[in-house]
């Protein structure tokens, strides 16, 4: 006897959840009231916080909700699919007695889901290996391992100067109109470990996976991500969760938690290294504010709830490495700063929780530089544990420090030039201006499909630093300077002679 897909799915669900305590379910009708995304229920027996509720509408459609608040026999439920069309008198409500769980499996790689975890790629339902609570399990702080070993993104400004450690959480601060979606897609295409390590479960490329969650994106952006991942072959190792702008706002509250639960399964049960990208966290915070306003809570700064810091931490702190497990979760949340304001509550609170930030700059974008990453306000607090001999290259730390110093001096020289003119500048200031121009055009700027290894980026950095005489590179140790400054100059001289044997003068190449 052949079974339908629906029957197989139900059998699988029953088998996976066997042993769970089954409680009788109680139905309630009518609904007490509707307020925005919330449904208020009266005379409820034993409601539980975070319990999942099924609402059956008069036309037979079923929507899911979650208990947000319990006051005696009254329960306040947030409905994930929105409250439009709910008839107060005819809607039937059923309390399931369970928290919201997501079916997880390795088969989720290469699949696309909506913001509630339902497949939208016309593929079959997921046959679950397990059902996991989307709020995750608390991790013993003592069991956490310090993040180390670098994740390569193929972007020079990130890999060389703001290296991301495996298990780190580092946000991208962007703003509306800036190419953060393109940068996110490029990171997904190019991300991987710098080298296979001895302690991983599997040294092959398949051991590195990506979980991508988009919240409040429009159809054009959604199509861009799906098409980009499919065309470049990165979809095979990626799980996508897409909450569109026309989807219910309330759904955005569970989308990042679904993504992180999937990431935890892949990292801690299949021992993969998972890069989790969440965009746009500003849409998530706005959904949080909407629910808070509907519950008539006392607002905090700019109308956001006072507990937003705590709520954001329940998402960001789910990154890291755990003792006894070879997998890791690295988080790169992306948020758009309203009015380019870095003091806005969303980037402000995010910066307190996370371990650095990557700053997308509008001025660089307006000058046609891609990716427009401003390295001066950017920071990776765990960079020191991810670079150096044995992990990248022994000159990495010194080169990064020197690039920061010379770029800052170049910015000062450009500001001085605007005041006094180029003729009044010293020789050192003119060198700094030359470095500034070539650093932005050749080092920060790169193609959207250009994947630079960390070694190519470091060699490119040396070719720029050789604009200065050796004695002016005061952030690099003499030993490193002796080994790399001369060697790289000789290599570049040889390359230039091959390209143009008759050329004389400055041997610096604009790589």
Swiss-Prot record:
Keyword entries, A-Z: ATP-binding, Hydrogen ion transport, Ion transport, Membrane, Nucleotide-binding, Transport, Vacuole
Entry keyword annotation includes Nucleus: no
Domain of life of the source: Eukaryota
CDD domains cross-referenced by the UniProt entry: ATP-synt_V_A-type_beta_C, ATP-synt_V_A-type_beta_N, V_A-ATPase_B
A GO CC annotation given for this chain: vacuolar proton-transporting V-type ATPase, V1 domain
Membrane topology (UniProt): Peripheral membrane protein
Subcellular location: Vacuole membrane
Biased amino acid composition, Acidic residues: 491-501
Chain segments carrying region Disordered: 484-511
Biased composition (Basic and acidic residues): 502-511
GO molecular function: ATP binding; proton-transporting ATPase activity, rotational mechanism
InterPro entries: ATP-synt_VA_C, ATPase_a/bsu_AS, ATPase_F1/V1/A1_a/bsu_N, ATPase_F1/V1/A1_a/bsu_nucl-bd, ATPase_V1-cplx_bsu, P-loop_NTPase, V-ATPase_su_B/beta
PANTHER family xrefs: V-TYPE PROTON ATPASE SUBUNIT B
Reported function: Non-catalytic subunit of the V1 complex of vacuolar(H+)-ATPase (V-ATPase), a multisubunit enzyme composed of a peripheral complex (V1) that hydrolyzes ATP and a membrane integral complex (V0) that translocates protons. V-ATPase is responsible for acidifying and maintaining the pH of intracellular compartments.
Protein name, UniProt field: V-type proton ATPase subunit B
Taxonomic classification: Eukaryota, Fungi, Dikarya, Ascomycota, Saccharomycotina
Designated gene of the protein: VMA2
């Amino acid at each position: 006897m052949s079974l339908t897909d629906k029957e197989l799915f139900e059998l699988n669900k029953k088998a996976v959840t066997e042993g769970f305590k089954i409680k009788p379910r109680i139905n309630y009708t009518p609904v007490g009231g509707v307020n925005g995304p919330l449904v208020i229920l009266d005379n409820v027996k034993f409601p539980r916080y975070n319990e999942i509720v099924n609402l059956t509408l008069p036309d037979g459609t079923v929507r899911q909700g979650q208990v947000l608040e319990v006051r005696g026999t009254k329960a306040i439920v947030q409905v994930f699919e929105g409250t439009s069309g709910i008839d107060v008198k005819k809607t039937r409500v059923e309390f399931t007695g369970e928290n919201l769980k997501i079916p997880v499996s390795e088969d989720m790689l290469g699949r696309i889901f909506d913001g509630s975890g339902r497949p939208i790629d016309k593929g079959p339902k997921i046959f679950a290996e397990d059902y996991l609570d989307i709020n995750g399990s608390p991790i013993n702080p003592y069991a956490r391992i310090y993040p180390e070993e670098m994740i390569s993104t193929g972007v020079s400004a990130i890999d060389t100067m703001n290296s991301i450690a495996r298990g780190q959480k580092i946000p991208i601060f962007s703003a509306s109109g800036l190419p953060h979606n393109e940068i996110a897609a490029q990171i997904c295409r190019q991300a991987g470990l710098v080298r296979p390590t001895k302690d991983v479960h599997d040294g092959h490329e398949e051991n590195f996976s990506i979980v991508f969650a988009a919240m409040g994106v429009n159809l054009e952006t959604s199509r861009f991500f799906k098409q980009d991942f499919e065309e470049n072959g990165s979809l095979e190792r990626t799980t996508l969760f897409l909450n569109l702008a026309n989807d219910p706002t309330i759904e955005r509250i569970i989308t990042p938690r679904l993504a992180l639960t999937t990431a935890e399964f892949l990292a801690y049960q299949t021992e993969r290294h998972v890069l989790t990208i969440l965009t746009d966290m500003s849409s998530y915070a706005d959904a949080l504010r909407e629910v808070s306003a509907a519950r008539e809570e006392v607002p905090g700064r700019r109308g956001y709830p006072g507990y937003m810091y705590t709520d954001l931490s329940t998402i960001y702190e789910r990154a890291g490495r755990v003792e006894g497990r070879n997998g890791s979760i690295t988080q790169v949340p992306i948020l758009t700063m309203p009015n380019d304001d870095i003091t806005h509550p969303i980037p402000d609170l995010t910066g307190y929780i996370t371990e650095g930030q990557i700053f997308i700059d509008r001025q660089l974008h307006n000058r046609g530089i891609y990716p427009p990453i401003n390295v001066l306000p950017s920071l990776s607090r765990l960079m020191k544990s991810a670079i150096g001999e044995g992990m990248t290259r022994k000159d990495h730390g010194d080169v990064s420090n020197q690039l920061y110093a010379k770029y800052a001096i170049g910015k000062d020289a450009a500001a001085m030039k605007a005041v006094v003119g180029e003729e009044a500048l010293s020789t050192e200031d003119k060198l700094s201006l030359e470095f500034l121009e070539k650093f932005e055009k050749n080092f920060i700027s790169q193609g959207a499909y250009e994947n630079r290894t960390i070694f190519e980026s470091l060699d490119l950095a040396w070719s720029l630093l050789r604009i200065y005489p050796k004695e002016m590179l005061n952030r690099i140790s003499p030993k490193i300077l002796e080994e790399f400054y001369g060697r790289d100059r000789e290599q570049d001289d040889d390359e230039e002679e091959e390209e143009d044997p008759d050329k004389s003068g400055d041997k610096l190449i604009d790589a």
